[in-house]
Amino acid sequence: LSGGPRVEVPGDPAKGARLYQDKGGCTSCHMIDGAGGLSGPDLSTIGDRRSPADLLSDLVEPDERVMPRWWRMRVVHRDGTPVAGRRMNEGTYSVRILDEDNRLWSFQKRDLRESERIETSSMPSYAGELSDDELTDLVAYLYGLIRDEEG
């Protein structure tokens, strides 16, 4: 949790919301208030957990702070079926993977021909993809996603 006091941020949150929905493609992986994808963190209250500087860093250098629960995995089953996606859980003998189509696969490790854990983010860097102004607007939008104090 960022835990610090709220700060004023530059940028236009309304423009940031449009970027989130459209050009950024964020909804394919991230969820806000129950709408969106499952393969990335839920951003419903991201403004409570990240500072504006952290949000910007997450957008331009997504590999810097990837938590293990967001690691990905590529496997090939002994029947030749390849599967790649988010590593949902992994034990000594089994692994479960959520693929890009939100299908959950479960494998016994002894049945895998190949297995590779990928400890980088599946999120692309938006450095060079979004302008500085667009990044500022997107950060303003994301930083405004906070817990409803009345709820």
Feature-to-residue mapping (PLM):
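Short, solvent-exposed loop/turn and secondary-structure capping segments
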Residues: 31, 39-42, 150-151
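Accessory interdomain/linker segments of ATP-dependent helicases and helicase-like nucleic-acid enzymes
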Residues: 3, 32-35
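Gly/Gly-Pro-rich "capping" loops immediately C-terminal to redox-active cysteine motifs
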Residues: 35-61, 71-125
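Solvent-exposed, polar/charged alpha-helical surfaces in well-ordered, non-transmembrane soluble domains
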Residues: 14-18, 53, 57, 133-136, ...
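C-terminal capping alpha-helices of c-type cytochrome domains
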Residues: 1-4, 9, 60, 81-83, ...
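Active-site phosphate-binding and catalytic loops of NTP-dependent enzymes
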Residues: 65-68
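Sequence/structural segment immediately N-terminal to covalent heme-attachment motifs in c-type
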Residues: 8-32
